[in-house]
Design a protein with these regions (language model features):
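A short SAM/SAH-binding and catalytic strip from SAM-dependent methyltransferases
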Residues: 1-7
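Short conserved AdoMet
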Residues: 4, 18, 75
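A short glycine-rich, Lys/Arg-flanked "PGG" loop and its adjoining helix->strand segment in the class I
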Residues: 7-22
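Conserved catalytic/acceptor-binding region of the Class I
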Residues: 24-92, 110-111
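Amphipathic alpha-helical interaction segments
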Residues: 65-68, 124, 145
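Core SAM-dependent methyltransferase catalytic element
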Residues: 73-76, 143-161
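C-terminal helical/coil "lid" or tail adjacent to the Rossmann-like core of SAM-dependent
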Residues: 79-140
């Protein structure tokens, strides 16, 4: 997601793995997150996170590219799995997960002028999300993650340039 040359980095890292060793990566598919019914606070957060990633040059759809990245790195095509945590009801741990994700991105949000700490109010964000989403009966699927894994074979990997 944050690498200019992900296949080259994967090739380099895979060289540290002994033959038969497992190579595993997980990446985001931002476009697959959604909520029903819509929750204004959640939609605002989603837009801020999206805009922050765009300003930073992150590839927010990198999960779809993992198969080709493994192959370009000289590895066998990986097995893959797609999953997403789902948030529903007042006891979901996802409210805190969402708030802490936003907290971790807040310095970048401010740096790029996407949102200010005063707008985000991260210290009570989890509680505000819980109240708003529970009142609306919102069910939210976080952006999906695609996991990819393969075993390194003796003959794997291209020579580094």
């Amino acid at each position: 997601m944050y690498l200019r040359e992900p296949a080259a980095v994967l090739n380099h890292l895979a060289r540290q793995v002994r033959p038969g060793g497992l190579i595993v990566f997980q990446e985001l598919v931002f476009s697959m997150g959604r909520s029903e019914p819509s929750c204004p606070l959640l939609e605002k957060l989603r837009a801020w996170v999206h805009d922050t990633f765009m300003h930073a040059g992150a590839d927010i759809e990198m999960g779809w590219k993992l198969f080709a990245t493994f192959q370009r790195a000289g590895l066998p095509g990986p097995e893959m799995f797609l999953g997403s945590p789902v948030c529903a009801g007042p006891d979901s741990p996802m409210y805190r997960y969402i708030a802490e994700t936003v907290r971790s991105l807040l310095p970048m949000m401010e740096y790029y002028g996407v949102a200010s700490a005063e707008e985000v109010m991260v210290d009570n964000l989890a509680d505000r999300l819980r109240i708003e989403m529970t009142a609306a009966g919102t069910v939210c699927a976080a952006p999906c993650l695609i996991g990819a894994w393969t075993r390194k074979l003796d003959s794997d990997l291209f020579q580094e340039a």
